[in-house]
Amino acid sequence: MIQRFRFGLPLPTDSVVQEIPVSAGPVPFLTAEEDGWAYRMAPDAIVYGLGEMPRGINKRGWHYVTNNTDEARHSEDKLSYYGAHNFLLIDGGAGRECFGVFIDFPGKVRYDIGYTEYDALRFATEEPDHELYIITGDDLNDISRQFRQLIGRSYIPPKWAFGLAQSRFGYKTAEDVREVARQYKENDLPLDMICMDIDYMQDYADFTVNKQRFPDLADLSAELKAQGSRLVPIIDAGVRIDPKNPVCAEGLANGSFCTKADGTPFVAAVWPGKAYFPDFLRPEVREWFGRQYKALTDCGIEGFWNDMNEPALFYSPERLKAFFESMDELSRKDNIVQDEFFGKVVGGALGLMNAPADYASFYHDVDGQRVRHDRVHNLYGGNMTRAAGEAFARLRPGRRTLLYSRSSFIGSHRYGGIWLGDNASTWAQLLANIQMMPNVQLCGFLYTGADLCGFSYDTTPDLALRWLEFGLFTPLMRNHATDGSRMQEYYRFADMLPALRKMLRLRYALLPYLYSTFMKAALENTSYFRPLGFDFPADPDAREVQDQLLLGEGVMVAPVYTQNASGRHVYLPEAMKLYRIRSVDDYDTELLPAGHHYVRCALDEVLLFIRPGHAVPVARPASCTAQLDETSLTLWACPDENGSARCRMYTDDGETSDFAAPEHWKVLELN
């Protein structure tokens, strides 16, 4: 059951698609406080949700703020990342209630989940006007399913988007891109996408191409597609200020940009320098901006990634001027003391980026109402995704277009996926990736993944392999790095190359199961990844597991995420069949009873556990998704006590939007 409660006159967010009448009665489970809401937690209560946030699967023990932020340093002390996902799913503990809470609010929401008082959960919206949805059901899976129905079907990408994406900030020429494709082919590594960062643009301006470095983008796109790969370019939120640029000129002429208090366009700097920012909260601006993608779809481009759309702000001219004046004053002093150096020099420079005062200095038009940006800040990136998603439905009707974004809000999951932002090449970030996935998908973002190997810092060969051994299970599987870091395309690691090749081929072999699991989750509002406690709520050990995930109906994964480890502890809430896999053709199996186990897992091995009565269809590996043959399959299985195992498999053309036809489903059974 879903109950809706309205307080004041909340601003629209378009997060919800299901019409729920407003309830007049008291809000169940929660206690109203002066500045928000509270819930008393039992000692064994668990709090899931909040999507893209730091720390573990259980969010208890920290405080958080949903405030979409260009956060380059991912660590446990952070309060916010790139997405605002205001859904909590509370497992009250033994003998207590389970319920979901969705806070539909476009600005900051502050959460204290056992941080101040370990038994107290509190949350408060920055303004009093908001809506609450309280969801109750039979169990955690049922509540999750109801929430997904409330917010609408998750975005479904083309099937080729489940292949490997190779990306880097630093592919500076068309020849760089060709060399990546050539090396993947020569090293017999499967590949489906090469993602281009802002290097391909002219002066870092959206919807432009540098003709000297990329003389014929359409030809490059066609050349790669003939080899089984797609080009996937980046688009940023800020529009470079250049009167000669048609996008800038059009946007100014039709009043498409966010404005300052005096009605003039708001200006801040990002990669191209000074930029304007489209007012994506207006339907006509979304339609206008979405049309601009045609310049690239006409070149044969079938996939995009949207970035810098929190929006990230490097500086505003006003704030930069004030900083320079402050530095000029300091430069005339003979001695700069500690407080001045760290406060004015270091703090002043760092304070230029994403300054709260800048976010409070420009405005949107929301249904004819002038609204200051910081009040609706979390809607911005999601509405850029919406602009693109709606445009692709017009530009490529009946066809699927790949789209994923950095910033998001619940609701934008209907238009595109997300990646988990600018992580780092550390083992801690691998664990963070594992722990973030179920909560992000709980909030509707099914097409999700992290930058494999890590985006910043220099990766190591063993981290590249171990991260791939988890990444081969995630819907978005992209290797991405920043300019200046170690080159980390998989063919670069000569000593690990045989193992990396086998793991990439394993991903493609498992696509019949992974794609079917994704489509089931999208079409039936079930989960792709979920914590063990969802299926085993009465098992206290299962509820506390933070580093194993259930994958669809029949599989559990337990990645190794510590350096130099040759195995790991695994908890099995029921008997399962272990597949210790070195390649599609080289693995050993063992039926393990329920309980605690130490399981050996060499650096070139991955652990896959199949639940009783379930089967996993396995294809022969392929060089790209287009070459995958799903007509001849092997079943990896864990037969039940009757000796049978089954799976539901989904097959379609992977390109069109005809999702619901019943003939796409078939049951494979082993007796």
Predicted regions and their residues:
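Extracellular structured ligand-interaction cores
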Residues: 82-86, 96-98, 106, 129, ...
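Catalytic and substrate-binding clefts that recognize carbohydrates or anionic sugar/phosphate headgroups
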Residues: 1-161, 168-169, 174, 181-186, ...
